[in-house]
Amino acid sequence: MSTTLLSPFYDIDFLCKTEKSLANLNLNNMLDKKAVGTPVAAAPSSSFTPGFLRRHSASNLHALAHPVPSPGSCSPKFPGAPNGGGSSCGPAGGGGLASYGQLKEPSGGSGTALVTKESKFRDRSFSENGERSQHLLHLQQQQKGGSGSQINSTRYKTELCRPFEESGTCKYGEKCQFAHGFHELRSLTRHPKYKTELCRTFHTIGFCPYGPRCHFIHNADERRPAPSGGGGASGDLRAFGARDALHLGFAREPRPKLHHSLSFSGFPSGHHQPPGGLESPLLLDSPTSRTPPPPSSSASSCSSSASSCSSASAASTPSGAPTCCATAAAAALLYGPGGAEDLLSPGAPCASCSSSGANNAFAFGPELSSLITPLAIQTHNFAAAAAAAYYRNQQQGLTGPAPPPAQPPAAPAPPSPPFGFQLPRRLSESPVFDAPPSPPDSLSDRDSYLSGSLSSGSLSGSESPSLDPGRRLPIFSRLSISDD
């Protein structure tokens, strides 16, 4: 046999071996992949392209194991070649029809070998054999048997068993997940802020769906010390009212009381006066103390003689003193700083409030007297000069000087000149004014000064229609006791 005939045979044999090795490589790649329906690349020289193969298809597996050679690969290229030249392609050299028939009817031996090779790469389409099922069942039984000794839950034995506490017996026995007695009770690792804040649901509607398992405070005995860096518990305590604080039994600071115990309707509210007058000087600077009450309360509870000076005193006072005690400012204008200090002694309310029996929370203390004293010093000279000038004009208008009456409020008020009542009105309208120099005889006669100031006050236009001229006001009755 010549070398020209051997070289084609050698090429054909090499090509067939290469195709077999490629087919085996593709089969291993397909078995390693887990996804069903993965496309498998066939041999580039083979005419059979399976496409998307099902992994549980035995015929496809056998087709990959025995690929179909191309018709030209096994046919003799040279006419001089013997018929045995095609037999060098292996068992498929018998013809394409025989190989194609093997795709549909695989032999039992080759199919069993392929399934055995693939047993370690089981897919969902293959049913599990008996050995694997028994192994899984054995593992499940071991897990169930060891559940009594293993603690799977973090709350194991952290709560008492309710049936055991009630009846003394438990049907689960030693396998019970709850503690049968305090000796089995374990401490559970809690959050650092556990039981440090109030339960909003429980303290709002009175019911909590979590019950004793709630992580927030329901009762006072459940409270735990708050962590060092957290101040949320104190903020939550302030968020609730006095009813919740009394229910929990916590010590709570008293709420600051307002200055104005008189409501806008003029009636006293139900606040009680604490002993000692004002609670603190800081209350004078609170926003609520700067709101003056309506003028209706001044007309109902204050005297007509002091109402002309009440608006000026309330406007120039920094704390906005209530107008129900405007007689104190009038006394400061009449008697100077000494009279104001006597009237504004601690625990001495005004006569109108004391006669009505109201528990007024606004009690005059040293702080208020110190605030009103500069007002009395500023307005004392001007009021004295105005009263003296009015009294001189009154005596000049009459035929003879009338003696001052024994009781100044009971004296009838004579008609006054036009300028007699303009000065007090200017005093009531402008809170800031300049005091003119006082005449030397303005403080010579105290009774005449008192009568003149009272007469000017009665003609200032603020006299109430129900005032009896023959009846003395309560504030002047108390002040005249020392004179008599």
From Swiss-Prot:
PROSITE patterns: ZF_C3H1. Residues 172-213 are annotated as: RNA-binding. Keywords: Cytoplasm, Developmental protein, Metal-binding, Nucleus, Phosphoprotein, Repeat, Ribonucleoprotein, RNA-binding, Zinc, Zinc-finger. Signal peptide: none annotated. A zinc finger (C3H1-type) spans 155-183, 193-221. Residues 100-152, 261-304, 395-484 are annotated as: Disordered. GO terms for cellular component: cytoplasm; cytosol; nucleus; ribonucleoprotein complex. Phosphorylated by RPS6KA1 at Ser-480 and Ser-482 upon phorbol 12-myristate 13-acetate (PMA) treatment; this phosphorylation results in dissociation of the CCR4-NOT-deadenylase complex and induces p38 MAPK-mediated stabilization of the low-density lipoprotein (LDL) receptor (LDLR) mRNA. Phosphorylation occurs during early preadipocyte differentiation. GO terms for molecular function: mRNA 3'-UTR AU-rich region binding; zinc ion binding. A motif (RNA-binding) lies at residues 155-160. Gene3D superfamilies: Zinc finger, CCCH-type. Its main location: nucleus. Disruption phenotype: Lethality between 2 weeks of birth, due to pancytopenia. Peripheral blood shows a decrease in red and white cells, hemoglobin, hematocrit and platelets. Yolk sacs from 11.5 dpc and fetal livers from 14.5 dpc display markedly reduced numbers of definitive multilineage and lineage-committed hematopoietic progenitors. Mice lacking the N-terminus (DeltaN-ZFP36L2) display female infertility, with embryos that cannot progress beyond the 2-cell stage of development. Show evidence of axonal and fiber degeneration. The modification Phosphoserine is found at S57, S127, S480, S482. Induction: Up-regulated in response to fibroblast growth factor FGF4 in embryonic stem cells (ESCs) in a p38 MAPK-dependent manner (at protein level). Up-regulated by glucocorticoid agonists, such as dexamethasone (DEX), in burst-forming unit-erythroid (BFU-E) progenitors in a receptor NR3C1-dependent manner. Down-regulated during erythroid cell differentiation. Down-regulated during the conversion from quiescence to activated satellite cells upon muscle injury. Pfam families: Tis11B_N, zf-CCCH. It comes from the Eukaryota. Residues 401-418 have a biased composition (Pro residues). Changing C176S: Inhibits RNA-binding. InterPro entries: Tis11B_N, ZFP36-like, Znf_CCCH, Znf_CCCH_sf. Expressed in preadipocytes and adipocytes (at protein level). Expressed at highest level in lymphoid tissues such as thymus, spleen, lung, uterus, ovary, small and large intestine, mammary gland, fat and bone marrow. Expressed at intermediate level in kidney, heart, adrenal, eye and fetal liver. Weakly expressed in brain, skeletal muscle and liver. Expressed through B lymphocyte development. Expressed in superior cervical ganglion (SCG) and dorsal root ganglion (DRG). Expressed in embryonic stem cells (ESCs). Expressed in oocytes. Zinc-finger RNA-binding protein that destabilizes several cytoplasmic AU-rich element (ARE)-containing mRNA transcripts by promoting their poly(A) tail removal or deadenylation, and hence provide a mechanism for attenuating protein synthesis. Acts as a 3'-untranslated region (UTR) ARE mRNA-binding adapter protein to communicate signaling events to the mRNA decay machinery. This is mRNA decay activator protein ZFP36L2. The gene is Zfp36l2.
